[in-house]
């Protein structure tokens, strides 16, 4: 099973797409940073013909590659890009009551290298990974948006364990189920936090394994399972293998590994391995038995995880462009998928083919 391409745009020649989210007829896309572009806004009321309505660059030396939208507000990160000598660090807030024409209304001015990936589904508090001054790498923070014109830091948490030589303990982002946050923490893997009080997070437990770069930790609501990606961060042949695991949160153990895509992807240039998952946000497609994974040069993969011990791939799509690096995705409630490429490929809109569409409908939460 697969998908058909509904439309494609190179985002005005700034095809380094990263995180993306839909809000009404607007689609917000962050950019990796190679192009110098920061954020693109598209009118996707006609998915077959997406139209750019706004686009603005990132500050010099900075990438603004993450977006979150809820409560008629858009949040955008500011983070040092690579080893830039001059950059800005912070969190920017836009009013999107007019979704296609965001208006900047607030900013938290940070220090250090800045904010990486934000998670916010509405309400007073957002949370994100960030590198404040005095820290060599990312920790996890909570930010108060009660006054969106003056966001402020409300809490921070970091793993209080010695980092072994050759390992990198760095927070990425957390997804919540109830009062538990499942936080990807790089080579420290999966950390569970009690966030009954978001301003006072407490460590519950940690599960680790061989391999690192733990990125996204998606709880499958009501199943006691978390699907975890380890991000591939090395190009080309001979890169370390990175996998997607299913973790039993009650037994605190890995129960299975999603089968990697078949083919010669590992021998191709650029990255081969997992990156992001569709995160089952409210208002989007939601399923506790189908998991969508972006897999860099192996495109988009869909897995059936009804039997957590025996997950299987049920659908795939690889863009025809040269050297694809499929990066992030958003799945609409109707099963339509928006996918970004991190190099030059820009944005794709995909429609599930009939057999796959039937499966998605049957498994929708």
Q: PLM features: residue spans?
A:
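Feature marking well-ordered beta-strand scaffolds used for ligand recognition
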Residues: 1-365
């Amino acid at each position: 099973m697969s998908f058909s391409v509904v439309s494609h745009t190179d985002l005005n020649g700034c095809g380094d797409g990263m995180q993306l989210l839909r809000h009404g007829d607007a689609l917000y896309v962050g950019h990796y940073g190679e192009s110098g572009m920061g954020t693109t806004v598209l009118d996707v009321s006609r998915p077959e013909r997406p139209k750019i309505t706004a686009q603005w660059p990132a500050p010099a030396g900075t990438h603004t590659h993450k977006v979150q939208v809820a409560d008629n507000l858009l949040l955008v990160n500011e983070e040092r890009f690579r080893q830039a000598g001059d950059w800005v660090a912070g969190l920017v807030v836009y009013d999107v009551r007019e979704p296609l024409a965001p208006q900047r209304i607030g900013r938290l001015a940070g220090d250090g290298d800045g904010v990486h990936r934000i998670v916010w589904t509405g309400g007073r508090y957002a949370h994100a990974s960030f590198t404040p001054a005095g820290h060599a790498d990312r920790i996890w923070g909570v930010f108060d948006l009660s006054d969106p014109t003056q966001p402020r830091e409300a809490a921070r948490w970091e793993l209080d364990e010695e980092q072994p030589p050759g390992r990198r303990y760095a927070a990425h982002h957390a997804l919540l189920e109830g009062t538990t946050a499942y936080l990807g923490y790089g080579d420290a893997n999966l950390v569970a936090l009690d966030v009954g009080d978001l301003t006072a997070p407490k460590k519950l437990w940690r599960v680790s394994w061989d391999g690192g770069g733990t990125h996204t930790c998606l709880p499958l609501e009501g199943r006691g399972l978390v699907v975890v990606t380890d991000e591939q961060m090395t190009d080309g042949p001979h890169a370390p293998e990175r996998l997607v695991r299913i973790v039993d949160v009650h037994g605190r153990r890995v129960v299975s590994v999603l089968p990697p895509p078949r083919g010669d992807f590992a021998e191709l240039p650029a990255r081969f391995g997992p990156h992001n998952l569709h995160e089952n946000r409210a208002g989007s497609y939601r399923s506790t038995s189908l998991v969508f994974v972006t897999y860099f040069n192996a495109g988009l993969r869909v897995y059936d995880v009804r039997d957590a011990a025996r997950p299987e791939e049920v659908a795939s799509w690889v863009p025809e462009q040269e050297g694809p690096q499929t990066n992030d995705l958003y799945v609409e409630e109707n099963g339509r998928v928006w996918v970004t490429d991190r190099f030059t490929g820009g944005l794709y809109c995909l429609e599930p083919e009939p057999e796959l569409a039937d499966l998605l409908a049957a498994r929708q939460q």
